[in-house]
Amino acid sequence: VPVTLHLEGADRLAAALRRSPQVVAQEQVRAMTRSLLLVEGDARRNVRQDTRQLMNSITHRQRMAGETLVGEVGPSVRYGAYVERGTRPHWPPRAPLEGWARRHGIPVYAVQRAIARKGTRARPFLVPAYEKNKDAIVRLFAAAGARVTATLATLSGGHA
């Protein structure tokens, strides 16, 4: 004897499921944007300022890598990585040091020689910004998941 089941509201559930990728994507982008802005703001505050060039270069971007939303925060100036991580001893080029040396009243050659002997000390600004905000980032994505669930429940005629 065949059994026939009739699922009431199946059409609303199917429609909600069809919309779920857009709902999930919208909430992911929202949580990612807020997360990136938190890290970007603290990274900017963490940077020691001379000309503000490094601070002003810190920005964020989002991109898709296949099915994965990727968020990145960082400086657009090349020397940002050297400030974050420091450097081993090396002989640096003169031109990038001239302005700094002049503002600090130090001969460029003396700065070059010091870097050649000792390298430069790391002055992390980005990693501490992430570390400070990682719990808040987890909460932002958890809240996004809750909003997705509530939205899909509403769209399917259920209760969140």
Segments predicted by a language model, with ranges:
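Short, Lys/Arg-rich flexible segments
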Residues: 1-160
